[in-house]
């Protein structure tokens, strides 16, 4: 009885870690898509500022991707 409840709790913990990694990936994908779309709108409005907009877009996307990578690594360490 006790062993089965411990195994069930461990399984739920692994499921939670996997869901956390999945949500982090989905959130990063949506965030980077939003960044790209907004940057394209801004470049369409002001083509002369495309260099600065593109630089800021790449930096912001890198920060979002870095946060997502940290979340995925943390979830991977917690799964064991």
PLM-predicted stretches and their roles:
Residues 1-80:
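Hydrophobic, small-residue-rich transmembrane alpha-helices and their short perimembrane loops
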């Amino acid at each position: 009885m006790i062993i089965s409840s411990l195994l069930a709790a461990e399984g739920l913990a692994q499921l939670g870690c996997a869901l956390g990694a999945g949500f982090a990936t989905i959130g990063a994908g949506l965030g980077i898509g939003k960044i790209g779309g907004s940057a394209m709108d801004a470049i369409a409005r002001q083509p002369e500022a495309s260099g600065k907009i593109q630089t800021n877009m790449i930096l912001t996307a890198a920060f979002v991707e870095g946060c997502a990578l940290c979340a995925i690594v943390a979830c991977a360490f917690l799964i064991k």
